[in-house]
Amino acid sequence: MLCLTSSSSSAPAPLLPSLADRPSPGIAGGGGNVRLSVVSSPRRSWPGKVKTNFSVPATARKNKTMVTVVEEVDHLPIYDLDPKLEEFKDHFNYRIKRYLDQKCLIEKHEGGLEEFSKGYLKFGINTVDGATIYREWAPAAQEAQLIGEFNNWNGAKHKMEKDKFGIWSIKISHVNGKPAIPHNSKVKFRFRHGGGAWVDRIPAWIRYATFDASKFGAPYDGVHWDPPACERYVFKHPRPPKPDAPRIYEAHVGMSGEEPEVSTYREFADNVLPRIRANNYNTVQLMAIMEHSYYASFGYHVTNFFAVSSRSGTPEDLKYLVDKAHSLGLRVLMDVVHSHASNNVTDGLNGYDVGQNTHESYFHTGDRGYHKLWDSRLFNYANWEVLRFLLSNLRYWMDEFMFDGFRFDGVTSMLYHHHGINKGFTGNYKEYFSLDTDVDAIVYMMLANHLMHKLLPEATIVAEDVSGMPVLCRPVDEGGVGFDFRLAMAIPDRWIDYLKNKEDRKWSMSEIVQTLTNRRYTEKCIAYAESHDQSIVGDKTIAFLLMDKEMYTGMSDLQPASPTINRGIALQKMIHFITMALGGDGYLNFMGNEFGHPEWIDFPREGNNWSYDKCRRQWSLVDTDHLRYKYMNAFDQAMNALEEEFSFLSSSKQIVSDMNEKDKVIVFERGDLVFVFNFHPNKTYKGYKVGCDLPGKYRVALDSDALVFGGHGRVGHDVDHFTSPEGMPGVPETNFNNRPNSFKVLSPPRTCVAYYRVDEDREELRRGGAVASGKIVTEYIDVEATSGETISGGWKGSEKDDCGKKGMKFVFRSSDEDCK
C-alpha cells in the first residue's frame, strides 16, 4: 500500500483496486489496463495553477468528456482560512490527486459515484424481470451455493458462478409467477475456501437478520426481506427543512422504554418522539440501527451493515419511525459505523475473510486489519469492492429509510494508522499530516461526503473526531474532508474533571471558556455536556455526579430541597445551558439527561445476571408532578425554545467580555443575547455591571432561577435594564470590558440569565416575555399552511398526524393562568 509522505515533491501513482479497469455487474465494457488520457483544457473545480498528468471526469459538466487531474495545486481555499496549512501543500496535493483519480476510475468504469453507490440494487438478493438474482463478492471462494429454507438448505441445485472480479452470482426464475425465495425466509451463502472446507455465512448485503431468542447465544440467520406491496411502508411526510443549527436528541431505541425489555421502533415513534418534539429539539440521532449481534456493544460492533436491528422490529417499522419523526418536524440522523466491523465470523462480515490477500478481503491483513482495543476488524478503504459496499451502505439508508444524514462513529480511528491509540494530540500540525495519516480512509470519507451532499444537499453529516484534524469540516472542493460538523469532545471531559476533582470555588472561569470556545475557525462543532459515553456503566451522568445517592431520597417536591439537591439542579441547568450557548454551532443531548435521569446504563450481560433494569428510561420520573425532575426538563425545553426564537447558535457573533475569577462570573454575547453566568456558590451580586454591544433596553429572556425551573425566583422579570454608554466613542480601550455599553443586573449564586434587547415589534410576538418566566410550552394546534412551511419556529406538515391535528407550532403563553 502507498503511504503518505508530506515531503514528497510529486504525487505517486494512485493505488488502484484489483482489476480496476472493470465494469460493475450487468454493465458492459472493461477488460484491460486502465488507459489515462490527457486533454488540453484544465479542470476548473480546483483553484490555482495546475500541472496536467492524470485524467478525471468533468463531473461539473453535462457531457462525459475526460479532463485533466491536478498533479499540483498552487492554492486552495483552505489556505486562505488557515495559512499554516500551506506548509503541508504536498500532502494536500497528494490527497486531492488520490481523490480525483478514484472518482475518475469510478466515473469511467461504473458510470459515476451515484451509479456506483446503487450497489444494494445489484448485490445481495434482488428481484429483476421475473427472476431472483443473488450476487456476492467472495474472491477467495472456490465454489459457492445459495442455501436457505427455500431449498431445504441444500445448495446442490443452486450453485453459483464466479466472474473474473471474484463476484459470484445466480439467477433463479420465478415459480408459478412467484419468487423462488419467499419473503421473510432464511437464507445463507455457502462457499468452499482455499483450505477445502465449506462454510455458511450470512449474505454481506442482507437487509434483515434474526436469531432464536429462546436459545442462549443462538447465531443469526440472514432473512430475505421483500414484502409484497400491501405490506411495504410508504412514506407520507416530506423531509423537514434543514435547520440553521441542529439541536440533536441522541437516542437508543432498544433502551427507550420504561419496562425492562427491548423497546420497538413503533413504541419509540409513538411514545418518545412526541417528548423530543415537546422539548423543542429539531433533530433525532438514532444509535444501534445497523444489526449487531452483541446488544451490549451499544450498536458499535456491526455484523450486518444493511440490516435493520431486528431486536426492535422490521425494516417497515423503522420506516414508520422515520416518517413519524418527519411528521413532527424532526430530522433523523443515523449513527453509522464505517470505522470498523464486528470480529464475529459466523454472522458477521468477518466471516468472508478466510486468509486471502488484502485485495481480496473487506479488511486489511495482519495487525493492520485488527483494532486491538476494540477487538474488531478494520476496512481496507483502497479496495474497489469495499468502496462500493460502504458508499452503497450510506445511500441505502438515505434512500430507502429517508435518513437526513449521519453521525460517523470512530473517525479518529479512520484518520490515522495508529487509530489514536495511546496518542495525545497537542495541536502540532505534523501530528495530522504525516506518515501516520491514513489517506485511503480520508479519500473514502471525501467520496462519501461528496456523494451524500450531491444526493441530498441538505444532509447533515457529523464526525466523531477527538484529534482536531484541520479541515475535516470544510467542503471537499475547498480541499477539506467534507463533514458539516464535528463533535466537541473535550467539553464533557472538562465537566467530568471539574465535578469529580474540583471544589466549586476552584472552578476556573477562563478554563471553562477556553474549553467551550476552543474550536477551529469556520469548522462547525456540535457541543454537548454529556452523551451516551458519559452514561454507560463505570461512569456517571452529570446529574448523578452532582446529587448521587440523594437522588433516591431527595427529589420529592413535597419536602424542602437539601443543599446537595439545590446545588445539583442549579448546576445541571447551568452546565447544559453554557455548553449550548458558548460551546459550538449545534447542541446534543442524550436521551434522559434533559431531566437528570439517575444512575447509569448497563446492558444485560453475564456480570449483571442479564438484567435490563439499568437498560431503560424511567419516564415516570419526569412525568410525576411532585418530583423535581420536571424542573430540569422544563429548563431544557425552554433553552431549546430560546434558541429556536433567537437562533444564537447559527450567529457568528460570539464575544466573551468577562471571565471574573474572583466573582466566578462569565459574561458573553451570542447573537442578539447577553448571557450572565454566576458560578459562585453563595454570592449574590446586586447592580452587577454587564457589558454589551448595542444601546437600549434589555429584558430577561431566560432565567434558570425561575420558580418553574425549580429556582428561587430571585430575578425580576418585569424589570427593564437600560444601558449606559461606556468610554469615549471610537476609543475601544476606554470601554467597559471592551464593550461600548453596559447595563446592571441582579445575579444570584449558581444562576444563569439570558437577556435580550427590546424590540417593540418583537415584543408583540413574544406576548409578554413568556420565555423569561419559563412559561413556554409546545402544544399541538390546528394551523393552516402549505406543506413544509415553518410557523413560529415549529414545523407544519400537510398530512394529519395521529392526533388528528394538521400541524404544530410553539405557543408562548404570558399569564400564570394559561400555564396551569
From Swiss-Prot:
UniProt record, GO biological process: carbohydrate metabolic process; glycogen biosynthetic process; starch biosynthetic process; starch catabolic process; starch metabolic process
Name of the protein in question: 1,4-alpha-glucan-branching enzyme, chloroplastic/amyloplastic
Q: Identify the residue position(s) of the site Transition state stabilizer.
A: D533
Q: Where is the signal peptide?
A: none
Look up keyword Transit peptide and say if it applies. Answer: yes
Q: Where is the composition biased (Low complexity)?
A: 1-20
Tell me how this protein assembles. Monomer.
What is the primary gene name for this protein?
A: SBE1
Which residue positions are annotated as catalytic? D409, E464
Upper taxonomic classification of the species?
A: Eukaryota, Viridiplantae, Streptophyta, Embryophyta, Tracheophyta
The organism encoding this protein is Oryza sativa subsp. japonica
Any one of the GO CC terms:
chloroplast
